[in-house]
Swiss-Prot record:
Organism of origin: Candida glabrata (strain ATCC 2001 / BCRC 20586 / JCM 3761 / NBRC 0622 / NRRL Y-65 / CBS 138)
Pfam families (UniProt xref): adh_short
Disulfide bonds: none
MF annotations from Gene Ontology: 3-beta-hydroxysteroid 3-dehydrogenase (NADP+) activity
Major enzyme class: oxidoreductase
Record keywords, A-Z: Lipid biosynthesis, Lipid metabolism, NADP, Oxidoreductase, Steroid biosynthesis
Name assigned to this protein: 3-keto-steroid reductase
Annotated EC: 1.1.1.270
Keyword Phosphoprotein recorded: no
């Protein structure tokens, strides 16, 4: 009996709708002779257990699936000691890593401006559910590490971890996938405020930083045998705003999503499974020596819901500034984190 090919995939934010569907699609794309270890990350152990059970149920529905093992990281990307502990765990357990999905999507939301929402929906319903201006975000929120919280959660924390595990990624000829957004417009980021301390659009701004960081680093990553891509999942139902919606507003949101797609919006995937198309596409289907890395790969859907991949160009203005800022901060934290590793492992 021949041994199975072992692969390791790390999925950050695996307990989200998108993260869970990335796991599903990644499993589907593996042949039966693969033994895939899924390393799911979350801030809490109960969420890890919940995700693992859901993935196990999915595997049970598949015909001739690959073998799937489970591991986990308890990591809070807004806590650099926690990030360092995650590195320590990965470094101790894995010689090579084949996939790394950066699905960090933290925001500092403060509800919905309902008057603004009604006005935008009435004046431009398609724009209202593509680039909403009525989501209220807090300004000036910092982490305990004194960084812009959303910047640290969505950009710097994951980047720092990736830099620490470069040997494992290189040995695994890994694909690194950064999840960006269709809302990552250059107007949402000031290069004088890269941590977005003064910004009221920190989520969108953080995804713009992701775009620029990718453009500034993918060639250097490729020189180490690591193929890095940036993708966006389009518009889909997520859990981040559920607490601000009731039954009627949720129904209204879904109605507008389907209406937008009917009117020709290719980005309204609605379903988390379709949203996960682009992340897994770049990780498993493309020829890394042919596909372009300087563009953003997007999950798209036709009017009747047929999924496909659409690429968009990325404005590279500011990419060198972003890299210089983040590299300087990385050196600062290398010094701060000396002798800071602790053990957070608990059996699942």
């Amino acid at each position: 009996m021949t041994s199975k090919t072992r692969k390791v995939a790390v999925i950050t934010g695996a307990n989200s709708n998108l993260g869970l569907n990335i796991a599903y699609r990644l499993i589907e794309r593996q042949s039966a002779d693969v033994r895939l270890t899924l390393v799911v990350t979350s801030r809490t152990l109960p969420r890890v257990r919940e995700v693992v059970e859901l993935i196990k149920k999915f595997v049970a529905t598949q015909e001739d699936p690959c073998s799937v093992d489970f591991d986990y990281l308890l990591v809070d990307f807004t806590n650099m000691v926690s990030v360092l502990n995650a590195y320590y765990d990965l470094n101790q357990k894995y010689e090579s890593i084949n996939y790394f999905f950066v699905n960090a999507a933290q925001g500092v939301y403060d509800g919905i401006d309902w008057i603004g929402a009604v006005k935008q929906v009435l004046s431009d319903p398609l724009e209202a559910v593509t680039n909403p201006t009525y989501r209220k975000q807090l300004v000036g929120v910092k982490s305990k590490d004194e960084m812009g919280l959303v910047f640290q959660a969505n950009v710097f924390g994951p980047y720092y971890l990736i830099q620490k595990i470069l040997p494992q990624l290189s040995k695994g000829k890994a694909t690194v996938v950064w999840i960006s957004s269709i809302m990552a417009d250059p107007k949402h980021l000031s290069l004088q405020d890269i941590e977005m301390i003064k910004s009221d659009v920190t989520y969108e701004g953080s995804k713009r930083v992701v775009d620029l960081l990718h453009l500034a680093t993918y060639k250097q990553m490729k020189s180490q045998g690591i193929h890095q891509y940036v993708v966006q999942p389009g518009i889909f139902t997520s859990y981040s705003f559920a607490k601000y919606l009731n039954f009627f507003t949720t129904f209204g949101m879904l109605f507008l999503f389907y209406l937008a797609r009917l009117l020709g919006s290719k980005w309204h995937n609605i379903d988390g499974y379709k949203a996960a198309n682009a992340p897994v596409y770049v990780a498993t289907l493309i020829n890394p020596h042919f596909e372009h890395q300087e563009v953003k790969y997007g999950s798209a859907s036709s009017r009747d819901g047929m999924e496909y991949i659409e690429t968009t160009d990325i404005d590279k203005t500011g990419s060198s500034d972003v890299l210089a800022y983040i590299e300087k901060k990385k050196l600062e934290w290398d010094d701060k984190l000396k002798d800071q590793i602790t053990n957070s492992r608990i059996p699942i």
